[in-house]
Amino acid sequence: VVAAGTDSGPNYAHILGIHKDQIVQELGWDEDSDDDIRADIEEACGSELLDEDSDEVVDVVLLWWRDDDGDLVDRLMDAITPLAEDGVIWVVTPKTGKPGHVLPAEIAESAPTAGLMQTSSAKLGDWTASRLVQPKSKAAGKRT
């Protein structure tokens, strides 16, 4: 018997730094969203992904985003609302050449406008993920 997640290539949750007991909210799911990425994340955190209607505080937001999905700044502002101060938003976009591809500049320009900064990116099969966080100075000001 092969353990789940060890038989089919990369562990996407590990690449994204998602681990047990983290609360992950998924935004922007559609038919083209990668079920392997979703399954790896659910297995790693030990629970199902929260949907868009959840009002829980979350550690990670997984935001599926395509070039025709609207205003990324507005969507990022919505994604920040449930995010813990040290939480992470992963903007997951189709990789270059795939339908719905988003230019990296769009994410780089939208993040600071939404009060976020991009720290890294990761390749996830046919998708590319950009890691966005709230600047430490902002988070530090909220700590007690």
Please annotate each region the language model reported:
Residues 1-144:
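S-adenosyl-L-methionine-dependent methyltransferase catalytic core, i.e., the SAM/SAH-binding region
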